[in-house]
């Protein structure tokens, strides 16, 4: 897991090239203007999913992880809390090849981050994440880019 902000150019310069490609794409395109849904950048190897939703409470959300792709969550507007843990600390359910989706169950939270505009979170296959959690007392309407980078 890597947590940071897209505007910290010096710090981000040491990140893997595939992650830096996400930031370059975001800086060259106004992602706030993108319609919700999948946008192909480089075939199945590199694409972005633009999502928008209202944050909520933990009881209404679920744990997930992925095997084929790295997730790079980039907050465009609003704020969202994301709970994190390692997949070995949760009960792994049946992996769904289509959609690259590993559902997990459990109550354990190892750590949490709050994403605000410009913040990013990189999730690797071992990083279970529970998204769409409200960051404070009030729900927030968010728009976020989730880059999918294939693991080669």
Q: What is each PLM-predicted segment?
A:
Residues 68, 105-110, 132:
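Short alpha-helix capping/helix-loop boundary micro-motifs
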Residues 79-82, 128:
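Short beta-strand segments in beta-sandwich/barrel cores
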Residues 72, 111-113:
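Short, surface-exposed secondary-structure edge patches
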């Amino acid at each position: 897991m890597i947590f940071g902000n897209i505007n910290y150019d010096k710090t981000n310069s040491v990140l893997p090239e595939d992650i830096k490609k996400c930031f370059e794409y975001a800086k060259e395109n106004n992602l706030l203007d993108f319609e919700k849904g999948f946008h192909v950048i480089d075939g199945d190897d590199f694409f972005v999913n633009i999502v928008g939703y209202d944050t909520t409470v933990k009881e209404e959300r679920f744990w997930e992880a992925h095997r084929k792709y790295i997730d790079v969550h980039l907050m465009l507007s609003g704020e969202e809390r994301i709970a994190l843990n390692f997949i070995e600390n949760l009960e792994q359910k049946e992996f769904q090849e289509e959609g690259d989706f590993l559902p997990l169950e459990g109550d354990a939270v190892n750590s949490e981050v709050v994403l605000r505009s410009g913040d990013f979170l990189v999730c690797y296959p071992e990083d279970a994440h529970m998204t769409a959690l409200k960051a404070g007392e009030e729900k927030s309407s968010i728009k976020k880019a989730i880059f999918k980078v294939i693991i080669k």
